[in-house]
């Protein structure tokens, strides 16, 4: 079995369904972590511009370094949410990669960050791929699109099967219910509580 890496399932999907990646023009990545996936997107989708959102102050220095490596990456240093008046962001003390706008059920520090709603940020152009890695805040992210969720063609979403890590966080069934206007094209259960979903507009 090949080692797991963040875009492995997406690459498998592209190969299995013979997706013409040259047709992708616009990619939105929410929860960029370090912008390494954004750099991978520039290779997988040679004609796409990637807009990457990350707000974790501990991660932003590395995001800036990686985003600067490609003129096709725009880094937006804001937290995507359906409640932009809430600026509180949680930084777990020990578990790397689990920072969230949702309150964790484990030890954390907190910080205030800039926020944004996607409905206000986006123009009317189509989004070929929406990538979401939001650590429990998936439905908040999707809600922030409002009617502009209709502009999205393909969604890749990492989500907990059962929400046991965050207070008020999303789980897989809630995300699928929110995306009932999309077709679930592929699903990977990476571990008993981590599901990766690829959905397409019906």
Explain the meaning of each model-derived region.
Residues 1-202:
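Phosphate/nucleotide-binding beta-alpha loop and adjacent structural elements of enzyme active sites
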